[in-house]
Amino acid sequence: MSAIVRIQAREVLDSRGNPTVEAEVYLDNGGMGRAIVPSGASTGEREAVELRDGGQRYGGKGVRKAVEHVNGEIQDALLGMEAEEQEHIDAALCALDGTENKARLGANAILSVSLATAHAAAHAAGQPLYRYIGGLGPLQLPVPMMNVINGGAHADNDVDMQEFMLIPAGAESFSEALQMGVEVFHSLKAVLQSRGLATTVGDEGGFAPNLPSNEAALELLMDAINKAGYQPGKDIWLGMDVASSEFYRDGRYHLASERRELDSAQFVDYLAALADRYPLISIEDGMDQNDWEGWITLTDRLGDRLQLVGDDIFVTNTTILREGIERGVANSILIKLNQIGTLSETLAAIEMAKVHSYTAIVSHRSGETEDTTLADVAVATGCGQIKTGSLSRTDRVAKYNRLLRIEEDLGDAARYPGLATFYNLD
């Protein structure tokens, strides 16, 4: 066993130039782990709370208070504890905070230490993190969901929906899937240039052109896939993060780019029509986080043929996920480590999803860093899918490169599930 002897946190920057927390955990046997916490732009109302300083410094986004919590009372509470006892450490962190949403110490402070502890224990054991968490059994690489057109809160354009994704489920390996995505990404750039559209990128590295409608983004992806020499719906499928809570007001869905306002039933019809016209296989946050009846209608309508992913509605929280399962809401959950704030609670959410035949997708945030922990978590849990942005910006590509190294490390034991990852669809 490896006792914690020192914890050190500092303020660093994320991919949007905003401060975030980095923590290092040191063990008595020389083991050391480091983790940096990401931050979201479109956040669910019930997410664990990241602690910001307020005031003028960094526009109020400084995290000195969170850093002080780590270097002070969190370190004092954890000194001497065994790093291998992850659940015990995470429970101690939650108890020390004393709130339901980690608002006192800050989920950013707590998560940085939780993840750094796992890294330190893995280092002490001489194992990569994915092996330390996942054990010695067979492991599978995730199918990437590549956000190549950014809109909504992730881009300064007039596209309502937040993400339009390539899902190369027809590949034979992760490395082939990545190659397919890269080739379509460059094909998409050429398509945009040929139409006089902007090729600037958004927070997650995808292109962010102004478009006349949300459907126009799907048309661009179809064109790019074909021009790259692949078949939509055979080699590469499409996915969307609608992020509907960002444009849901007064009981209606406001599609500003299309000058339309739809009620819940009409918006379900709208999404169903897109699913009929395009090879969509995944829709995330199709309904507002508080529109539970709308979610039930959407699931009844499309849940047998589309992955319906709950992000803002579930916020990686097992209590809310359990309610969703009981009420027949969605058939998949997005997993964001900083939504819940500890590694143990993250793993519990993935396990609950699996037990109830919900798929789970390990996901980045729009404000990312060079930290690649989520790639290891995706492999360790065998969740089968990962969302970590487009094929540009080092904060996104770092995760893909980590997965390439893991695939190489696993060798012949590496499995890529492909279309089988959508096991709960007809």
From Swiss-Prot:
GO cellular component labels: cell surface; extracellular region; phosphopyruvate hydratase complex
Subcellular location per the Swiss-Prot or TrEMBL entry: Cytoplasm; Secreted; Cell surface
Superkingdom of this protein's organism: Bacteria
Keywords for this protein: Cytoplasm, Glycolysis, Lyase, Magnesium, Metal-binding, Secreted
GO molecular function per UniProt: magnesium ion binding; phosphopyruvate hydratase activity
Recorded catalytic activity of this chain's protein: (2R)-2-phosphoglycerate = phosphoenolpyruvate + H2O
EC supergroup of this enzyme: lyase
Residue sites binding Mg(2+) per the record: 241, 284, 311
Active-site annotation: 204, 336
InterPro entries: Enolase, Enolase-like_C_sf, Enolase-like_N, Enolase_C, Enolase_CS, Enolase_N
Cofactors, names only: Mg(2+)
EC number annotated for this UniProt entry: 4.2.1.11
GO biological process terms on file: glycolytic process
Binding site for (2R)-2-phosphoglycerate: 162, 336, 365-366, 387
Similarity comment text for this entry: Belongs to the enolase family.
Function: Catalyzes the reversible conversion of 2-phosphoglycerate (2-PG) into phosphoenolpyruvate (PEP). It is essential for the degradation of carbohydrates via glycolysis.
Name of the protein: Enolase
Species assigned in the record: Acidithiobacillus ferrooxidans (strain ATCC 23270 / DSM 14882 / CIP 104768 / NCIMB 8455) (Ferrobacillus ferrooxidans (strain ATCC 23270))
Gene: eno
